[in-house]
Curated annotation (Swiss-Prot):
Full protein name: Ubiquinone biosynthesis O-methyltransferase
InterPro entries: SAM-dependent_MTases_sf, UbiG_MeTrfase
Summary of the function given for this chain in its UniProt record: O-methyltransferase that catalyzes the 2 O-methylation steps in the ubiquinone biosynthetic pathway.
EC numbers on record: 2.1.1.222, 2.1.1.64
Gene behind this protein: ubiG
Matching NCBIfam families: UbiG
Binding site for S-adenosyl-L-methionine: 44, 64, 85, 129
PANTHER family, per database record: METHYLTRANSFERASE, UBIQUINONE BIOSYNTHESIS O-METHYLTRANSFERASE, MITOCHONDRIAL
Family: Belongs to the methyltransferase superfamily. UbiG/COQ3 family.
Listed GO biological process terms: methylation
Catalysed reactions listed for this entry: a 3-demethylubiquinol + S-adenosyl-L-methionine = a ubiquinol + S-adenosyl-L-homocysteine + H(+); a 3-(all-trans-polyprenyl)benzene-1,2-diol + S-adenosyl-L-methionine = a 2-methoxy-6-(all-trans-polyprenyl)phenol + S-adenosyl-L-homocysteine + H(+)
A Pfam family annotated for this UniProt entry: Methyltransf_23
Pathway: Cofactor biosynthesis; ubiquinone biosynthesis
Length: 242
């Protein structure tokens, strides 16, 4: 096993970037490949807004923003939002959609580690949704998010647990049976157990506040948040006050 960590500037999996570049033009198609993201976005936004005590007037960073679905919705809540992504095409789509929607979001193509080196403790809220399982060194991303948030600020992560059920649900079910997302979107080896994520959080100024599962019911075709983190889950952390 290679124990070398990717350099700060290269914590990027170009195969992962290519996957999303290929379908970027359909990011805002409510019936396309990103339909699940559109479906779960109200749940994500509601969780972030409630746990943060509202977003109005706050400075927010969305790490791995893609085409801007969450970033735009947080801007609509009155936040000043910056979106980071390493995919050129998704960012172009995000910028164009924000322009067409009259929503102001600043989008930047750089890694979160690079951003942290220049903007430490600058954000009230940092979000990192469905991104950790797509990079070579997710631990480095967690550390960078911790560096970017202000003392007392909130950091949110969401990812997929690594076990047999998550493989069946997120890979076999979502990609091959229900065809909710393109085949090859996920690699179960890159999924992250909650204990692993929490161990990385514990290495920083962040402290766990709450964890919840994101559940899909194929019979009713609905999503909900609730107990149980065996497949998708969201974690709310808070930075220690100075």
């Amino acid at each position: 096993m290679n124990t070398e960590k990717p350099s700060v500037a290269h914590n990027v999996d170009h195969n992962e970037i290519a996957k999303f570049e290929a379908v970027a033009s359909r990011w805002w198609d409510l019936e396309g490949e990103f339909k699940p993201l559109h479906r779960i976005n109200p749940l994500r936004l509601g969780y972030i807004t409630e746990r943060s005590g509202g977003l109005f007037g706050k400075k927010v960073l969305d790490v791995g923003c893609g085409g801007g679905i969450l970033a735009e919705s947080m801007a609509r809540e009155g936040a000043t939002v910056t979106g980071l992504d390493m995919g050129f095409e998704p960012l172009q789509v995000a910028k164009l959609h924000a322009l067409e929607s009259g929503i102001e979001v600043e989008y930047m193509q750089e890694t979160v580690e690079e951003h942290a080196a220049k903007h430490a403790q600058q954000y009230d809220v940092v979000t990192c949704m469905e991104m950790l399982e797509h990079v070579p060194d997710p631990q480095s991303v967690v550390h960078a998010c911790a560096q970017l948030v202000k003392p007392g600020g909130e950091v949110f992560f969401s990812t997929l647990n690594r076990n047999g059920k998550s493989w069946l649900m997120a890979v076999v079910g979502a990609e091959y049976i229900l065809r909710m997302v393109p085949k090859g979107t996920h690699d179960v080896k890159k999924f992250i157990k909650p204990a692993e994520l929490l161990s990385w959080v514990d290495e920083t100024v962040l402290k766990e506040q709450h964890i919840t599962g994101l559940h899909y019911n194929p019979i009713t075709n609905t999503f909900k948040l609730g107990p149980g983190v065996d497949v998708n889950y969201m974690l709310h952390t808070r930075a220690k006050k100075a």
